[in-house]
Amino acid sequence: DGVAVSFKLSAFHTCFNVCNVLILIWFVHFIEKTVCKIIPQKEQEEEYRLQFITGGMLSTAELSILQARKEINLFAERIQRMFRMVRDLLHTENENDFNKLFSRVEKYENISDNMELEIANYLTQVSEGRLSSESKLQIRGMLREVTEIESIGDSCYNLARTINRKRRGNEDFTKAQYEHIAQMFQLTDNALTQMLDLVRDTHQQVDVNKSFNIETEINNYRNQLKNQNVIDVNEKKYDYQMGVHYMDIIAECEKLGDYVVNVVEAHRDVKEKKA
């Protein structure tokens, strides 16, 4: 009868759905990876927006300063991400992939400029309120941090442009040059990682010695490579122009390291004023 037919149909659909779930549940991760490859993710614009100071001033200056600190920390994280893109750019061989990554670095450079301006404007607004002398000194130090972090972004973009110029030429770096650049990039990334550890830590005493030690390593390595470059060019291990590109990268890393130390020193000053 009709009731029996309805019951059988319902039972069939229920069993069918249960079987589907039991079968497909084992392929969830595979399906996810397949869909992600077929449908490329859009670049997440929210990644590039300010996250902590978009709502304007808070009820007290101290809370506003705290929000600005969070934004500065996020700014520093994005700058390290930008540097790692540059590191990947050096070893990107496919022309289309290279152009996409270079464009992304350019985009990050523009974002860096905008973040510096917006955070600085916010801190300036905060400074116009009623503040203690200690809070005013904190803001001054934070403004310096923001300026130096933006300078790191400029250095990252300069590195990307040098890599792009080298790519447009007919020659390539030697194996030894690639190894030396990789070592310098690692030292630079270590400096950025140490900087992030310091700016994120709002409770402990800031020990800048490790940052200074890394900077000394970078300077010494730059000097060593600079001297060796003169010898290698004279011995015709590579031509003069490749030596120029090579040393531009090495020198820019050293300059980036200087900006990192400036951020660390500014943050130390902020912590001392706050203490």
Where are these regions (language model features)?
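Cytosolic, long alpha-helical scaffolding segments
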Residues: 1-12, 16-275
